[in-house]
Amino acid sequence: PSVSRSAKELKAYHFLENEILHLDSDFSDFPTNVDQLAVWMQKKNKTQCLHYKEYLERRENGSAREFFGTTSKAYEFLYKVAPTKRVDGAWLYSFTQYWNDPAFRDFIQIYVEELGLGSSQSNHVKLFNKLLLSLGLHQFSMNLPDEYYHQSAIQLALAYAPSDFIPEIAGFNFGYEQLPLHLLITNYELKELGIDSKYFNLHITIDNFDNGHAQLA
């Protein structure tokens, strides 16, 4: 049976309240002053790029792959992250109801780009599913323990979160759209193993600091 939007919002509200209650934020160096965000983001981006440069130097000097020692390890990674990749960008869905408010324009732009800007072939979820299908991994995630679905459950809850959570959704988006070191290494090593890394390379391109999602966020 169809579930009403209000019922989804109520479930999302209680779920997210519980998640926030158990959130450990002590490790975060996130600035408390919004005026410091640009500097913080630039510093983080430079740090990631420096670490990636060091990684490339290690590899050029004969170091082994650091993420995927074998093809099977790469396959295992792909189907284990599938639950999260299959809801890529979902957290911004709740902002589409504010489509006529200029304050939400950049968020909605990110969302429609995640959907492929009207092209199903560019839809991020479809790209990832296509990758899994090409490798015969499309059904493996069905047997994963519940904890592998935790992150995707959070993103889907944000997708239906009521307006109370606008700051949390914006903050989640800001953090998620930063370019992480693990994405750069994953893209490099998958290509090295002959695995199509288009999905990951796409996120490196669109999440860039200068004019991509990281800047829009």
Please provide the spans of the model-predicted regions.
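Non-heme di-metal
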Residues: 1-217
